[in-house]
Amino acid sequence: MRLISWNVNGLRACLGKGFLDFVALADADVICLQETKMRSQQASFDLPGYHRYWNSADKPGYSGTAVFTRTEPLSVTYDFGEDVHRHEGRIITAEYPDFYLVCCYTPNAQDELKRLAYRMKWEDDLRGYLCQLDLIKPVIYCGDLNVAHQEIDLKNPKTNHFNPGFSDEERGKLTELLGSGFIDTFRALHPDATDAYSWWSYRAASRARNVGWRIDYFIVSERLRDRVRKAEILADVMGSDHCPVLLEIEA
């Protein structure tokens, strides 16, 4: 089974930058999108062979997630936990016979960590949710998690320490998740890979110079470890300030 996750930073814009060509070439069974910034009724493009599910923010043109899947899920849900988490379109859970798929766009802690308190609540509630799902069947959790876990996961860790996405608090929450029976598939297969990033600022030619961060992940239940065949960053794919990430896992 082949899965793609991509923060498209506005799907309508990405459609004009080769999105459908990429989908055709990727030949993925499941495509998870973050930061779609659109509603399902605005999706005028054709995507034959895929069932499409959307979770849009209450605020137009903001946030949003989508899942395109060749196999129709048993069920699809669009929220978790308390009502506070249900207004920004940040999560879709698709249940399949043998696993849960969770597509997520994690809230950014924002400049000066203004939203860190909410981010911490999100992380705690989501970890509890993922652990509950994992008691029932294995979980594939993917998306833009808005955190570089270790120093190896961004170009300039020293100057970014305490910045949003690399604060001790955010990194610690990912450590807690990985200590709860989950693995970072990219690091499981590529423990020492350097200069492997999935997001680059639009400033200062950061992408051309590969001054980036790895903040997009496929995280899976520990018991799926031996079924992971490939976990890659598709850094050559343009269309957003993020690139897609890929997981191939034995069905």
Model-derived segments and spans:
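N-terminal, active-site-proximal structural segment of metallo-dependent hydrolase catalytic domains
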Residues: 1-47, 51, 57-63, 78, ...
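Active-site-proximal beta-strand elements of phosphoester/diester hydrolases
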Residues: 1-9, 98-110, 142
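Active-site beta-strand/loop signature of hydrolases that rely on acidic residues for catalysis
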Residues: 7, 23-41, 101, 130-151, ...
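Metal-dependent phosphoesterases centered on the DNase I-like endonuclease/exonuclease/phosphatase
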Residues: 30, 51, 122-211, 215
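Structured beta-strand-rich core segments of catalytic domains in phosphoester-bond hydrolases
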Residues: 37, 42-109
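Conserved beta strand-loop-helix elements of the APE1-like EEP
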Residues: 60-75, 203-226
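Active-site beta-strand termini and strand-to-loop segments that position acidic
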Residues: 70, 94-97, 221-222, 247-251
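Surface-exposed cleft-lining segments at the edges of enzyme active sites
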Residues: 81-82, 107-123, 158-162
